[in-house]
Amino acid sequence: MKVVKICFLVLWMALIFSFSNQRDVDSSKISDGFIDRTVVKIYKVFNENITKEKENEIIEKYTYPIRKLAHYTLYFILGILAFLVVKDYSINKKLIIYSLLICFLYACSDEFHQLFIIGRSASIKDVMIDTFGSLCGISIFYIFNKKISKKSV
């Protein structure tokens, strides 16, 4: 089971790497497409007559928060996966610290990697969002894990 957990962690890291490896134009197309398929559709439910100009305005308005939410979510899941791996190898007291350290270092390396991609840059703000997402994932899963452990005793 340890190997399976490690594989999921590495595959998730590879997914994050693949997103970071996209040029800015390609990354924006994905974000804008997602916003068009979700947020714009929701707007259309409540307001049938949305012009193309209004659609573009909606996309522009929501691009930044959606992209940051994507960072948070990817690293929230990474935090859970790191926790599951570290749990198999770590003393309970250091579980959260080691899990968070893995995620923080990966977030730093991810931002460093983006320096070498056309149109991309590194952002300390993104590292902070990523780390916070990881901390939330780790914390929620830790609490959930504690409650399950108490019930089984």
Question: What is each model feature region?
Answer:
Residues 2-4, 89-98, 123-124:
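Membrane-helix interface segments
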Residues 1-73:
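"…centered on the first transmembrane helix and the immediately adjacent amphipathic helix/loop
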Residues 108-129:
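Interfacial helix-loop-helix junctions of multi-pass membrane proteins
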Residues 74-88, 132-147:
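Membrane-interfacial alpha-helical segments at the cytosolic side of multi-pass membrane proteins
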Residues 64-78, 124-132:
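Membrane-interface loop-to-helix entry segments
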